[in-house]
Amino acid sequence: ISALRSIEGISWKKFFDSTSTVEKKLQTDPHGTYTKMDFKSKDYYRHSIEKLARKFQVDEITLTEKALYLATRAKEEGKRAYRTHVGYYLIDDGIKDLSNELNLHVKANNKFSEGLYITINIVCTIIIVSAILAFSYVLGARFSTGQLIVAALLMIVPANEIVVALINWSVSKLKPIRHVPKLDLSEGIPENKKTIIVIPAILPNAKRTEELMKQLEVSYLGNKDKNLYFALLGDFKDSKVEKTSDEEEIIEAGFKEALRMNNKYFNGEKHFFFLSRKKIYNPKEGVYMGKERKRGKLMEFMNLLRGEENHTFSVMSSYIGTLKDIKYIITLDADTFMPRDSAIKLVGAM
């Protein structure tokens, strides 16, 4: 009974890490990333080694050593950083290099050929259209050449939709799902990976501005971290004049919400921001509007973070100097909420 209790108390993750020869070798990854990854990602690498070892008919240790050799050689030769990570040769395009190093020259990737996808798509669409026309002929329908061409053209889109749906379903069932490796950020986002979550949106009125700021608040409540920041990037609605009477009310609403949340959750420290851009006259549209819409907001926000002056942000709720070290930007649509703990997972994957 005592022995059973002792077994129950063992951390099998730690036990495996301390006894697995493959695990110990992987920890010498030249890129230094493997030891920083979460357990699920490490486990994905180990399972990939098992599958490749069976496919190549070599033992797991030999395969791991070859992958490490390729990563080390890439580092010594000054190749791009991702090629110095052992994972590149276990789950990515480097599998081909690994098979060549083992003198196997086996095509070992699980990628669905783009050319094959297009070919199947076209052939199946033609078959469906032809089958429908043939069936119509059997039932007694008679068409002129022109009518056949028109009928075929009209059926191409719906037939192709059916084919695409069937191909996507088949691929999802036949091909293994590829896990996206992630860093272990269970202790929080580090200082060198500061991230900001932004919502680029058009602000028609003060009420909508408050709603979007509160949406950022909900995202924060499910993703609390000292190195996570939040911002609403707003454009005023298009108008025939450069400024409208309701813009000041919108700005006031954004400022008020940013101040409220910073005081409530961070004792005044700036983690929530409201920014809006001045409108630029667009001669093609004949109105004043935000430059390049959503794309423009994001591009100019990145310029702003880099300290550049080529942007049209004219209103900021507070000094953005605290954002100069931001490394990642996560963009949410105006109707999207950030799921609980998903921000940390995304940062770990990036």
Where are the language model's segments positioned?
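Juxtamembrane/interface segments at transmembrane-helix termini
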Residues: 137-143, 162-184, 210, 234
